[in-house]
C-alpha cells in the first residue's frame, strides 16, 4: 500500500523519506545502511519501512467498476 505519512508509534513524519530510501536500495545499499543514511535512528520508524509491502500495483489490476457494468 502507500507508505503512512507518520510513524504509528512516535508520530514522526516518514513519508518524505520513502522515495530516497527506494533510490538508495536501487544503487545496492543495504536496508540498514540506507536507513542510517536517511537519519532514521528510531526502531519504530525503521520498522515502518522494513515492514512495508508495496502492493498498490497489484490492487490496481482489479477493476470493480468494470465488473458491475458488465453484469448490467
UniProtKB/Swiss-Prot annotation:
It is found in: Nucleus. Its main location: nucleus. Keywords: DNA-directed RNA polymerase, Metal-binding, Nucleus, Transcription, Zinc. GO terms for cellular component: RNA polymerase I complex; RNA polymerase II, core complex; RNA polymerase III complex. It comes from the Eukaryota. It holds the Pfam family RNA_pol_N. One of its GO terms (biological process) is transcription by RNA polymerase II. InterPro entries: RNA_pol_su_RPB10, RNA_pol_suN_Zn-BS, RPABC5/Rpb10. Zn(2+) binds at residues 7, 10, 44-45. Belongs to the archaeal Rpo10/eukaryotic RPB10 RNA polymerase subunit family. DNA-dependent RNA polymerase catalyzes the transcription of DNA into RNA using the four ribonucleoside triphosphates as substrates. Common component of RNA polymerases I, II and III which synthesize ribosomal RNA precursors, mRNA precursors and many functional non-coding RNAs, and a small RNAs, such as 5S rRNA and tRNAs, respectively. Pol II is the central component of the basal RNA polymerase II transcription machinery. Pols are composed of mobile elements that move relative to each other. In Pol II, RBP10 is part of the core element with the central large cleft. Component of the RNA polymerase I (Pol I), RNA polymerase II (Pol II) and RNA polymerase III (Pol III) complexes consisting of 14, 12 and 17 subunits, respectively. This is DNA-directed RNA polymerases I, II, and III subunit RPABC5. It comes from Encephalitozoon cuniculi (strain GB-M1).
Amino acid at each position: 500500500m502507500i507508505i503512512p505519512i507518520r510513524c504509528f508509534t512516535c508520530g514522526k513524519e516518514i513519508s518524505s523519506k520513502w522515495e530516497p530510501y527506494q533510490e538508495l536500495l536501487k544503487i545496492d545499499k543495504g536496508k540498514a545502511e540506507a536507513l542510517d543514511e536517511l537519519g532514521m535512528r528510531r526502531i519504530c520508524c525503521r520498522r515502518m519501512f522494513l515492514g512495508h509491502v508495496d502492493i498498490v500495483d497489484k490492487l490496481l489490476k482489479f477493476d470493480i467498476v468494470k465488473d458491475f457494468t458488465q453484469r448490467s
